[in-house]
């Protein structure tokens, strides 16, 4: 099938920073935190200079509007991994500037809608989140499956931040439900209270841990233990 771009796009400013047409079919989605409450236009603007050596396929501004920075047919430079970017649609999402890099409800709702659209146009009925790097990277998706991956697996970063990382199970669940599919993969528990996220973060920070270490701990708590902040 030919490559298309999302009809949800409200603004287009194409970046010169890409590798041309993909060498792998699209079977991953990689959401990122852009580290700033930026507009859809500003996210594209971040990737216009060739000196930046970075880009993404889509941006989601702080008001929930979607921008197109690199067409889906082309590999963006977003995840510090050639292999991942060749097969992933990369999405930079407006966020706070510091951990847990929280995103507002408009951004999250648009991320869900954009993921649904990407899956539909690429013939996918399920969006999967395993919460495990090795399992994800060694998994061969079925023809109707799309898989979530994250930037932190390929670089010394916390991206997409503890806020979104803890919600990727919920993202996969909501998208799959809207696609009419089903999944047996366990979802990461949804974290519903931002204040509790920050309480845990500040507690661990007070123990002398750095931001990257705290992000990893919080992600593991939510993804693997089944706990929610309200239970801790």
Please name every model-derived segment.
Residues 2-12, 18-23, 97-190:
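Basic/polar, cationic surfaces and motifs that engage anionic cell-wall
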Residues 1-85, 188, 196-206:
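N-terminal catalytic cores of peptidoglycan-degrading enzymes
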Residues 31-36, 60-63, 69-73, 92-96, ...:
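Active-site-proximal beta-strand/loop segments in catalytic clefts of secreted hydrolases
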Residues 116-123, 209, 222-226:
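Hydrophobic/aromatic-lined pockets within catalytic cores
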Residues 24, 84, 100-108, 190-197, ...:
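Solvent-exposed, acidic/flexible segments
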Residues 28, 88, 147-149:
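Structural preference for beta-strand elements that scaffold enzyme active sites
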Residues 58, 91, 111:
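Divalent metal-coordination and catalytic microenvironments
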Residues 211-232:
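Catalytic glycan-binding domains that act on GlcNAc-containing polysaccharides
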């Amino acid at each position: 099938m030919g490559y298309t771009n999302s009809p949800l796009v409200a603004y287009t400013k194409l970046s010169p920073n890409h590798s041309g047409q993909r060498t792998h079919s699209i079977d991953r989605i990689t959401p990122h935190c852009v580290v700033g409450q930026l507009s859809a236009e500003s996210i594209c603007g971040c990737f216009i200079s060739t000196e930046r050596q970075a880009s993404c396929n889509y941006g989601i501004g702080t008001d929930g509007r979607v921008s197109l920075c690199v067409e889906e047919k082309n590999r963006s430079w977003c995840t510090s991994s050639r292999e991942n970017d060749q097969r992933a649609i990369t999405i930079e999402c407006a966020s706070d500037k510091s951990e847990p890099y929280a995103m507002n409800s408009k951004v999250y709702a648009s991320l869900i809608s954009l993921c649904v659209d990407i899956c539909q146009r690429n013939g996918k009925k399920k969006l999967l989140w395993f919460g495990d790097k090795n399992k994800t990277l060694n998994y061969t998706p079925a023809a109707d499956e799309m898989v979530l991956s994250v930037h932190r697996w390929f670089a010394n970063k916390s991206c997409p931040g503890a806020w979104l990382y803890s919600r990727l199970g919920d993202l996969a669940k909501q998208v799959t439900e809207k696609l009419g599919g089903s999944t047996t993969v366990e979802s990461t528990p949804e974290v519903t209270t931002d204040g509790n996220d920050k309480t845990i973060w500040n507690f661990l920070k007070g123990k002398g841990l750095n931001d990257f270490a705290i992000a990893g701990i919080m992600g593991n708590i939510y993804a693997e233990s089944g706990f929610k902040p309200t239970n801790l």
